[in-house]
Design a protein with these regions (language model features):
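Claisen-condensing/thiolase-fold acyl-transfer catalytic domains that form or cleave C-C bonds
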Residues: 47-126
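Short hydrophobic/aromatic-rich motifs at helix boundaries and adjacent loops
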Residues: 3-6, 30-34, 59-64
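Phosphate/pyrophosphate-binding loops at sites that engage ATP/ADP/AMP, CoA/4′-phosphopantetheine
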Residues: 29-45, 94-99
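Condensing-enzyme catalytic core mediating Claisen C-C bond formation in acyl metabolism
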Residues: 1-26, 30, 111, 124-126
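A short, structure-level motif marking secondary-structure boundaries and short turns
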Residues: 16-18, 43-45, 75-76
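General structural feature for long, well-ordered alpha-helical segments within catalytic domains
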Residues: 16, 24-31, 42, 54-58, ...
């Protein structure tokens, strides 16, 4: 604890952004597809993606690659980035806006500061 080995400090945010930008979209897309497949679905069956709040261009790129049309998207511009809860708030908004039907496949996407990306596949409904 005294040596701060228990946490990750970003000492150069600009350099980190420069390294993340070229890989983030493909990593988000890859983990989304893998989550669908590992859950017994085809990636084309994904009906909703709840994503960590990012810059709009990255969000748009991921949604387009996964085939999610604008009318089925939730971009958290009314909330802003709230950290790990972003995908859950997007899922809440999708449910509130009636974007999900029983049996739909929803995928939640997130990322960590240590160059990690993750996805969870959820079959919606009873």
């Amino acid at each position: 604890m005294a040596n701060r080995m228990h946490c990750f400090d970003v000492t150069d945010p600009a350099a980190m952004k420069e390294r993340l930008d070229p890989v983030s979209a493909q990593r988000f897309i890859g983990v989304a597809r893998a989550a669908a497949e590992q859950s017994g679905f085809r990636p084309e069956e994904i009906r909703f993606v709840g994503m960590l709040h990012t810059k709009r261009s990255l969000f748009d790129q991921v949604m387009a690659a996964l085939g999610i049309p604008p009318e089925r998207q939730v971009y958290l511009d009314e909330y802003g980035h709230m950290s790990a809860i972003d995908p859950l708030v997007a899922l809440y908004e999708a449910e509130r806006r009636a974007l999900l039907a029983p049996g739909d496949l929803a995928v939640l996407l997130s990322a960590g500061t240590g160059y990690t990306w993750a996805a969870t596949a959820i079959r919606w409904g009873p």
